[in-house]
C-alpha cells in the first residue's frame, strides 16, 4: 500500500532457483533458500495480509519461475496463487519475433547448459552457456582485478541502466555491455549473445509450437499434434 492508500495491481512472486534472467536475490548462494518456495511464500502471505487487514483477493498474487505444465499451474492456483507468469516458454513460440537461432538456443539447452552469474546490474542472473558468456566467466576474476574499479563510457550511448558495473566501475558487479549482448542474442548471434533462460525443461521439450498450443497445454493439459505445413521444428 502506498502513501495514498492504494493497493498494488498485483504482486509477482519469482522463484530465483527456477526463473531466467535477473533474479531477485542478493547473492548466488541464496537462490535455493527454502524461504523462496512458492507454497511457503503463499502460506506466509496469508498471515501478512491478515495483519494488514487485507483479504487474499485484494491483491492478486502471480507466481513466476519454472512453471512448465498444466499440473504445476493447477497446484499453484489451488495453493492460492491468482495466476502464473511464464517467460522462456513464450519466448520460443512460433509467434515470437526473435531470430530462429535465439529460439534454438533456448529450446535445446539442457540443465548442464545453463549457468548462474553476476550481471552488470549487480544481481544474480541465469542464462545459457554461449561461447561469449563462457569466455567472459573464465576471465571474470582477471577482468575485475584489472578494470573492475574503472569507469567507462557507455558503448551504445543508451544509458540503459541507472547503475551499471561496466560504466560506473562497480568492481563486484559484472563488466560487459548488457545491451550489446542482448541485442546480439535477439539477432541470433549465438557466438556473441547473452541468452537469458529459465532452468526448467520447456512444456514442449525442444519443439517450437504456437502460443495457442502452449496456452491450451497449460490450461487443459491437452497436447495437439503439430499442424502440418505450419512453421514449426524440433531440435530433439
What are these regions (language model features)?
Residues 1:
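Short, acidic/polar
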